[in-house]
Amino acid sequence: MKKIYLDYAATTPVDPRVENAMLPFFSKKFGNTMSLHSFGQDAKLALEQSRETVADLIGAKANEIIFTSSATESNNLALKGSAFEASTELSRMSMPKSHYAGHIIISSIEHHCVVEAAKWLSRGFEVTKIPVDKYGTVNPKDIEREIRPETILVSIIHGSNEIGTIQNISEIGKICRQKKVCFHTDASQSFGKILIDVKKMNIDLLTASSHKIYGPKGVGLLYVREGIKLVPLLHGGGQENGLRSSTVNVAAIVGFAKACEIYKKGAKSENQRLIRLRDKLIKEILKIKGSRLNGHPKNRLPNNVNVRFDFVEGESLVIHLDLHGVACSTGSACSSATLEPSHVLLATGLRHEEAHGSLRITLGRWTTEKDINYLLNVLPKVVGKIREISPFKN
């Protein structure tokens, strides 16, 4: 039985061209970038060339790119680094102790690593969660209303990893710049899928991940706009402008850069192809009785389809589809193994049973029309079969 992978939002296979670019850095150009000899300098050159390639994709300067081990680390560095810097600055100003805690704003549909980092910081900082509408869209005016003098950071996800909704990051960034508040966006799902310009979009901090764009796991980035100060989470040799001490993973970073290069060359045509397949999938799935689309009908990532079915559990759908050779998910790969309903879907106003009946299908570079047709043939049968035995039906 042929297996069809439709869970590209969870992770992507490494592109063979990326693999080939990485190979020399495992056994030939393996030097430590901090070493003065030729092995180290060759590695250092590859690192800096990769930094330039990645920076170019988002309109940043090379020195504004900090390589990390993952999007989770980048998001933690953005939130905690900003919070610790604010505390340090207040301490320098000899502010009263009661004034030490600043204010952080996030949305109610952030990735778990942002939610948990903010929760951890709430022991010393006030955290406000901005609600979303039924499509999972944040109203920039709600953010503007919540910003106050002690607000140190606004962190809003760019493209939802679960429902695919794209936020108006440019408008949010403009508001934050006018209010002189640092603005971070988690672009883990949008980076390498839609065009991003950090300068035009008024972004101060941006998170991205390699394994979401056909690069290797174990490497991510944090864009840090020139002039933005963060306190590092890791202390040691002072790599990555002192913000991320550790021996640099050159092979993975080279792979990340190659993945960015490949995306940039074919971005327009690939996005159009994915949108065509996505829209076909949505149109045909919504013909199934009791089906509804989650997320915004238009402002969504080009590869994301998230639907729900009356009287059908998402976990059952995933298992039955897997038996037919199709890999999908119920939501975020970081939480879909639990039985808890998605906090993202609940934030859009769905009831628990509706959130439990959702299925996320995400397309990618190797998704074909034939794959989509196969899923469209199998899915109605699977939904009908599960519905027949559903305890919720009557």
Locate the predicted segments by residue.
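Pyridoxal 5′-phosphate
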Residues: 1-394
